[in-house]
Design a protein with these regions (language model features):
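N-terminal subdomain of lithium-sensitive/metallo-dependent phosphomonoesterases centered on the IMPase/IPPase/PAP
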Residues: 1-93, 114, 173, 177-180, ...
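Oxyanion/phosphate-interacting regions
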Residues: 1-15, 21, 177-181, 196-259
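Residue-level signal for inorganic ion chemistry
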Residues: 24, 48, 59, 96, ...
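Conserved beta-strand termini and adjacent loop/short-helix elements that scaffold enzyme active sites
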Residues: 71, 167, 190, 233-235
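Glycine-rich active-site/cofactor-binding loop and its immediate structural neighborhood
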Residues: 84-128
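Acidic beta-strand-loop-alpha-helix segment within the catalytic core
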Residues: 110-197, 245-259
Length: 259
């Protein structure tokens, strides 16, 4: 993909995500690993730091002039960020709680944001050895150890049971209120950005997120949902989520659904 003076080879980004996943698995497969709590009480492990360092180094080698915003470098000021037209937005380890629980439902997320929209997204699930890829103007795809397939969202048909994906770690009253509006539904619990990817590949119709998330939690999978024919919309304005438009890096509540 050509972005102004930058030629982006998505295969290189896939390789970066997989390399970060391998680094995470080295720590995941140890008998024990260190973790601590950040200021917001979210967990931080040595795997988060190792993956962050690897991704930052590799992206700086591939695109030395494109800035990088990571969950682990979120202290970068709005005064600096608002000058960015194009930047990498990464979550080195999304689903740290799932990582600590050792249920395998965590991901590496790398997105390229251009003019506030996610135009490239790679989500890699190291334990599952599955990778989802979205690139603006091209079909979304899912890569496994067996094959690579084009993926598409699945529209809901009248009378059909809604398949709704929800957070394994953050389900709450807001989700229950949302579900009351649906006549028939089946709830699928999942961790990390895999939830958005399930909508992208047609395994779920909806993912309502009516609780706090940050921009690095959604950007990569958002690009994949877009490429698969879906959308990620603000629950209040019904407009697509945008990135780096304000001082706060918090997302509004949102819904992931087919177009």
């Amino acid at each position: 993909m050509q972005i102004e003076e930058h030629e982006i080879d998505v295969n290189k980004i896939i390789n970066v995500a997989k390399a970060a996943g391998d680094k995470i698995l080295e720590i995941y497969n140890k008998e024990s690993f260190d973790h601590q709590l950040k200021i917001d009480n979210s967990p931080l492990t040595e795997a988060d730091i190792a993956a962050h360092n690897l991704i930052q180094q590799r992206l700086e080698e591939i695109t030395p002039t494109i800035p990088i915003l990571s969950e682990e470098s979120s202290f970068i000021s709005w005064q600096e960020r608002k000058q960015w037209k194009c930047y990498w937005l990464i979550d080195p380890l999304d689903g740290t709680k799932e990582f600590i629980k050792k249920n395998g439902e965590f991901t590496v997320n790398i997105a390229l944001i251009y003019q506030n929209d996610p135009i490239i997204g790679v989500v890699h699930a190291p334990v599952l050895n599955e990778t989802w890829v979205g690139e603006q103007g091209k079909p979304a795809k899912k890569i496994t150890q067996f094959d690579t397939k084009i993926i598409k969202v699945k529209p809901h048909n009248r009378g059909e049971v809604y398949k709704v994906v929800g957070s394994r770690s953050h389900a709450g009253d807001s989700l229950n209120e949302f579900l009351k509006e649906l006549e028939k539904y089946e709830l699928v619990s999942m961790g990390s950005s895999i939830k958005l990817c399930l909508v992208a590949e047609g395994k779920a119709h909806l993912y309502p997120r009516l609780g706090p998330t940050s921009e690095w939690d959604t950007a990569a999978a958002h690009a994949i949902v877009n490429a698969a024919g879906g959308k990620v919309i603000d629950n209040e304005t019904q407009m697509p989520l945008q990135y780096n438009t304000k001082d706060s890096l918090r997302n509004p509540h949102f819904i992931v659904q087919p177009n």
